[in-house]
């Protein structure tokens, strides 16, 4: 009986959050180990289904860097990263398109639809479809890194129509310049940020392989305000790959996204814990 009561109390704790977030838009960037391990993949799909069943509108943007690297290695194509961004020649772009749009996007859609069988399910898109992600060429610190795109505009009309019809858009980050018809590989974090900003999302959630932003003792910093992050970078608390994520988070907050969350996708149900409990499990960034 005590265990049953405990479960009831957990549901009761979630009620204020469910009420507050009903009908709101969450943009989730899906990547890392959560995309690679079977148990984590299925756990993630169930979590997204639960968000949908309690009335939250979810837009999913996925990465796939490890799968792209594995395919490039199989094809004996060398790959190089410049400050976390893949240098993308024509061959690498073709592989990225094949892996992101042809394989991963459809795998994710089918996995989500299995868990949302009695409602409008997931629908797979890329940034090419209906000019969803219109891009210009991206330069990394002034360096030409090939066919890498920076999102210029988002077709929010299409996304809004889909979520109003209760579909869950699943977006592969391949964008296009419609004037030149040139396709571009887009960093998934950057794509998710632009989509969240242009939708005015309630939340932007990054799934990573770490427990959010850590202090120098290795403990998770549960919340960061926009006026704190520069100091955390300057004193070496935030380093390496977390710097572009925190920069994206601050950009999103300043452009109208209410809160950004950086959580560990290797922990089962981390999204539910972060969204529906007072304590959370990762780092929350806000004004």
Swiss-Prot record:
Catalysis: reaction(s): N-acetyl-L-glutamate + ATP = N-acetyl-L-glutamyl 5-phosphate + ADP
GO biological process annotation, one example: arginine biosynthetic process via ornithine
Pathway(s) annotated for this protein in UniProt: Amino-acid biosynthesis; L-arginine biosynthesis; N(2)-acetyl-L-ornithine from L-glutamate: step 2/4
Location in the cell: Cytoplasm
Cellular component terms per the entry's GO annotation: cytoplasm
Function: Catalyzes the ATP-dependent phosphorylation of N-acetyl-L-glutamate.
Official protein name in the record: Acetylglutamate kinase
């Amino acid at each position: 009986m005590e265990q049953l009561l405990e479960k009831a109390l957990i549901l009761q704790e979630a009620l204020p959050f469910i009420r507050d977030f009903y009908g709101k838009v969450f943009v989730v960037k899906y990547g890392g180990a959560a995309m690679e391990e079977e148990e984590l993949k299925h756990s993630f799909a169930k979590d997204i289904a639960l968000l949908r069943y309690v009335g939250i509108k979810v837009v999913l943007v996925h990465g796939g860097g490890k799968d792209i690297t594995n395919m490039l290695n199989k094809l004996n194509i060398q790959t190089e990263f410049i400050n976390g961004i893949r240098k993308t020649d024509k061959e690498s772009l073709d592989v990225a398109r094949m892996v992101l749009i042809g394989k991963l996007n459809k795998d994710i859609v089918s996995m989500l639809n299995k868990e949302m069988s009695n409602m409008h399910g997931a629908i797979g898109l890329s940034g090419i479809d209906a000019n969803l992600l219109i891009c210009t060429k991206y330069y990394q610190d002034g360096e030409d890194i090939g066919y890498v795109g920076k999102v210029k505009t988002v077709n929010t009309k299409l996304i809004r129509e889909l979520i109003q019809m209760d579909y869950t858009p699943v977006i592969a980050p391949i964008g296009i310049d419609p004037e030149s018809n040139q396709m571009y590989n887009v960093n998934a974090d950057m794509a998710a940020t632009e989509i969240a900003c242009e939708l005015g999302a309630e939340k932007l959630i990054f799934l990573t392989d770490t427990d959010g932003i850590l202090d120098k003792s290795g403990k998770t910093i549960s919340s960061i305000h926009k006026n704190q992050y520069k100091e955390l970078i300057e004193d070496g608390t935030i380093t390496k790959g977390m710097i572009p994520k925190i920069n994206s988070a601050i950009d999103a907050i300043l452009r109208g996204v209410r809160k950004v969350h950086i959580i560990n996708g290797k922990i089962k149900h981390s999204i539910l814990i972060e969204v529906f409990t007072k304590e959370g499990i990762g780092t929350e960034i806000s004004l």
